[in-house]
Design a protein with these regions (language model features):
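Intrinsically disordered, low-complexity acidic Ser/Thr-rich regulatory segments
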Residues: 1-56, 66-76, 120-125
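Forkhead-associated
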Residues: 62-108
Length: 125
C-alpha cells in the first residue's frame, strides 16, 4: 500500500565524510537533492552542509555539491568551488574558478586543510 507521505520523505542521497585531523573530529554529513553548500560551521551561517572545524583555511561557504538524477535515475554529483580563498581540490587537482567537476562515490576532495570523501547512499563509512 502506498503511503501518502512518501513524496515528502527524503530520499537518501549519500553523505560526505569529513576525515579527522588536528582541526576537527570525524563527521558524517548527509546530502540532499539540489545544492549542498559545504563550509565551516558558524552560528548564523545559513549554509546547509556545514561541519565543525577550527581550520582557518576552510571558508564559511567553501564549495557546493549539486545532487541530481541522470536520465536513468542514477544519482549524479557535481562539485564546484564557491570562489574560496584556498580552492577546492579533487584528488590533488584544483577545480578552476567557474568550472564544475563530476565526482562519484569514493572520490576524495580537499578544502583548505580538510579532506572529505563522498559516499553514495548504499555505502557505509
Amino acid at each position: 500500500m502506498a503511503d501518502s507521505n512518501a513524496s515528502t520523505e527524503e530520499t537518501p542521497c549519500g553523505s560526505i565524510v569529513v576525515i579527522e585531523n588536528v582541526f576537527h573530529y570525524k563527521q558524517i554529513i548527509p546530502l540532499q537533492m539540489g545544492d549542498n553548500v559545504i563550509g565551516r560551521h558558524q552560528k548564523g551561517n545559513p549554509i546547509n552542509t556545514a561541519f565543525e572545524t577550527v581550520d582557518p583555511s576552510v571558508d564559511l561557504n567553501h564549495c557546493t555539491i549539486n545532487v541530481s538524477r541522470d536520465k536513468q535515475g542514477r544519482l549524479k554529483y557535481i562539485l564546484r568551488d564557491n570562489n574560496s580563498n584556498t580552492g577546492t581540490f579533487v584528488e590533488n587537482v584544483e577545480i578552476p574558478p567557474r568550472e564544475r567537476r563530476v565526482i562519484e562515490s569514493g572520490t576524495l576532495f580537499t578544502i583548505g586543510g580538510t579532506s572529505i570523501i563522498l559516499k553514495g547512499p548504499d555505502e557505509e563509512d
